[in-house]
Amino acid sequence: MSVESFTPTALQFTQGAAHKVKSLVDEEGNDRLKLRVFVTGGGCSGFQYGFTFDEDVAEDDTIVEREGVSLVVDPMSFQYLAGAEVDYQEGLEGSRFVIKNPNATTTCGCGSSFSI
């Protein structure tokens, strides 16, 4: 019998996203806030991304730190986000956090819905 260990693929947190999180945290005046990224069922492609700020971190959450701020992902969402990149973009459509997910087989035009 053999036992294989599993090492999850890292979640990337870009410098642009980290700077925006830091700016928003500073604006709120609460350095305990972290950006929580999650996946829920729904959207036009089956799953959708969500973002919120959270002070709490569960024992089994994955934490990615950059530029003195933290991105937090729960274990259920991490399985869909392993290897993805969380970025912040500003453009004609407005400003928003975006996820570039290599696991997604299809994505919606809005960028917040995907399928695997």
UniProtKB/Swiss-Prot annotation:
GO cellular component, one term: cytosol
Cofactor note: Binds 1 iron-sulfur cluster per subunit.
MF annotations from Gene Ontology: 2 iron, 2 sulfur cluster binding; 4 iron, 4 sulfur cluster binding; iron ion binding
Annotated disulfide bonds: none
InterPro entries, sorted: FeS_biogenesis, FeS_cluster_insertion, FeS_cluster_insertion_CS, FeS_cluster_insertion_RrpA, HesB-like_dom_sf
TM annotation in the entry: none
Cofactor(s) it depends on: iron-sulfur cluster
Swiss-Prot/TrEMBL GO biological process terms: iron-sulfur cluster assembly
UniProt keyword Metal-binding present: yes
UniProt entry keywords in alphabetical sequence: Iron, Iron-sulfur, Metal-binding
Binding site for iron-sulfur cluster: C44, C108, C110
Subunit: Homodimer.
Family membership noted in the UniProt record: Belongs to the HesB/IscA family.
Protein's job: Required for insertion of 4Fe-4S clusters for at least IspG.
Name the record gives this protein: Iron-sulfur cluster insertion protein ErpA
Natural source organism: Pseudomonas fluorescens (strain Pf0-1)
